[in-house]
């Protein structure tokens, strides 16, 4: 992965967070002039608080999210203020929410 260090304003940065049974992954990127997503950095942590798509230990899950987001921040050099988060499973419901990251 080539290192691209540009100064962006937060609306230009796109951050995805995936909380899964085996890993928690974060990716940081932006849309380039051609409309393609350029990856600036990523983070990955073991998911120890999720089983079969269900969060059974919120503290372990939060710890994994913090590790993944911190790694993505360190690798991308970008401030992460907002994320698009996803978690798959049978018993989830969806709502729009905002809070500290």
Regions found by a protein language model. Name each.
Residues 1-6, 14, 40, 47-48, ...:
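Helical "lid/coupling" subdomains associated with nucleotide-phosphate turnover
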Residues 2-37, 83-86, 95:
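Gly/Thr-rich phosphate-binding beta-strand-loop-beta motif of the actin/hexokinase/Hsp70
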Residues 22, 62-66, 77:
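Amphipathic alpha-helical transducer elements in NTP-driven molecular machines
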Residues 22-56, 100-101:
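Short glycine-rich, Thr/Ser-proximal phosphate-binding strand/loop in the N-terminal lobe
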Residues 26-29, 66-70:
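Short, well-ordered amphipathic alpha-helices
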Residues 50, 77-101:
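Short beta-strand-loop/turn "lid" adjacent to the catalytic site in phosphate-handling enzymes
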């Amino acid at each position: 992965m080539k290192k691209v260090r540009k100064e962006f304003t937060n609306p230009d940065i796109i951050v995805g967070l995936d909380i899964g049974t085996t890993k928690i992954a974060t990716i940081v990127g932006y849309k380039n002039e051609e409309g393609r997503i350029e990856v600036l950095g990523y983070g990955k942590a073991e998911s120890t608080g999720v089983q079969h798509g269900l969060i059974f230990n919120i503290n372990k899950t939060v710890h994994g999210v913090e590790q993944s987001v911190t790694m993505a921040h360190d690798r991308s050099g970008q401030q992460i203020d907002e994320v698009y988060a996803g978690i798959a499973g049978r018993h989830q419901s969806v709502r729009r929410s905002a809070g500290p990251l």
